[in-house]
Amino acid sequence: MLKEEDKIFTNLHGGQIHDLKSSKKRGDWDNTKALLDKGRDFIIEEIKKSGLRGRGGAGFSTGMKWSFMPKNSEKPCYLVVNADESEPGTCKDRDILRFEPHKLIEGCLLASFAIGANNCYIYIRGEFYNEASNIQRALDEAYKDRLIGKNACGSGFDCNIYLHRGAGAYICGEETALLESLEGKKGMPRLKPPFPAGFGLYGCPTTINNVESIAVVPTILRRRASWFASIGKPNNTGTKIFCISGHVNKPCNVEEAMGISLKELIEKYAGGVRGGWDNLKAIIPGGSSVPLLPKSLCEVDMDFDSLRTVGSGLGTGGIIVMDKSTDIIYAIARLSKFYMHESCGQCTPCREGTGWMWRVMIRLVKGNAKKSEIDELLNVTKEIEGHTICALGDAAAWPIQGLIRHFRSEIEDRIKSYSVAIS
């Protein structure tokens, strides 16, 4: 359990005013110049030592990612913050944008300095109108107070931060599709290599980070890497914002230590499963793109490695709880429809496969299928997985794989019941 004094996001639920003056009282912008004066190498090394891993889903080392940027580039370097939060079941970044905007902006300055970027773009989801307005007000405050812009915080470093609104496409949450959109083109993922650190925005070195990954940076640097690394578990350090939704008594966002058990998280903060733990059927532990877990596996620790060992993933930390009243086949079919709708259509396996999977899933919901089609569907998911430019194909395949792995008998019973009903 995370101690109160170790929480980074002290205004996560918006109980206090989030303007610049109030944010400073909570510790934001506290002697930021001193952190900048320590130099680029110090910042990158501290983030590496902290063990911070990307909070957007991939879980790659943030400090390592920054170190890939060239130190003496002839081209301008860019930092891009991915605030295009569109994963079903995930709303953590939204609360940071709403209630902790200055943590994000200060993090942008420190991260930009670390990678040598004089320009930073915050790419925000198109539907986040109020959040975009909130961030823009915070940016205006920071510019007025000379915390960013020319000679940011009196450090001699120039850092301009721009807000860019998306247009509602889920695919633009993929980092290279986001760059395409930012350049004014259709948001379609790029082939890699080249990677953004070498050829990113406008063909220049670019680092893309998630909102939460950037927002925790100032606190890590102030309290030092050893403090952050002491929280959580080895290789899964620090705090994490978890979004708990679905069939719980008190849906909420909560900051907790990495490695807390899934059951403890739900019972302590979300008031438990509706109808009690015995009424639990399954949980999606990391946003809609990771495989679900049946009740028997739902006491797993919430970290990257533990969830991988049980065949799922931490993803964004979006926990979707489903009780025994849930039609689990329909629930996954609905996710299939989402991925079909959001596919950009660039890759044939994803363009054709997501639609095919959804049509089969709809028949499985009714039971209007043959048992052999279950294995056929599973084989198609494996043909899509790993055969697309970006991970949307994987995200569409994994929920179905999880369903078949853990609830095959329920699918078979549905098919049998349908056959009996029409005979």
From Swiss-Prot:
Source organism (scientific name): Rickettsia akari (strain Hartford)
UniProtKB keywords: 4Fe-4S, Flavoprotein, FMN, Iron, Iron-sulfur, Metal-binding, NAD, Quinone, Translocase
Q: What is this protein called?
A: NADH-quinone oxidoreductase subunit F
Q: Which reaction does it catalyse?
A: a quinone + NADH + 5 H(+)(in) = a quinol + NAD(+) + 4 H(+)(out)
Family membership noted in the UniProt record: Belongs to the complex I 51 kDa subunit family.
Q: What does this protein do?
A: NDH-1 shuttles electrons from NADH, via FMN and iron-sulfur (Fe-S) centers, to quinones in the respiratory chain. Couples the redox reaction to proton translocation (for every two electrons transferred, four hydrogen ions are translocated across the cytoplasmic membrane), and thus conserves the redox energy in a proton gradient.
* Residues at which FMN binds: 166-213
Question: Has UniProt tagged this entry with the keyword Transferase?
Answer: no
Q: Which SMART domains match?
A: NADH_4Fe-4S
Q: Which PANTHER family match?
A: NADH DEHYDROGENASE [UBIQUINONE] FLAVOPROTEIN 1, MITOCHONDRIAL (PTHR11780:SF10), NADH-UBIQUINONE OXIDOREDUCTASE FLAVOPROTEIN 1 NDUFV1 (PTHR11780)
Q: Does the keyword Iron apply?
A: yes
Query: What does the record give as cofactor?
Result: FMN; [4Fe-4S] cluster
Q: Which residues bind NAD(+)?
A: 54-63
Q: What is this protein's gene name?
A: nuoF
Q: What does the entry's cofactor note say about binding and number?
A: Binds 1 FMN. Binds 1 [4Fe-4S] cluster.
Family matches, as InterPro entries: ComplexI_51kDa_subunit, NADH-UbQ_OxRdtase_51kDa_CS, NADH-UbQ_OxRdtase_suF, Nuo51_FMN-bd, Nuo51_FMN-bd_sf, Nuop51_4Fe4S-bd, Nuop51_4Fe4S-bd_sf, SLBB_dom
What are the binding positions for [4Fe-4S] cluster in this chain?
A: 344, 347, 350, 390
One Pfam match: SLBB_2
GO terms for MF: 4 iron, 4 sulfur cluster binding; FMN binding; metal ion binding; NAD binding; NADH dehydrogenase (ubiquinone) activity; quinone binding
Q: What are the EC numbers?
A: 7.1.1.-
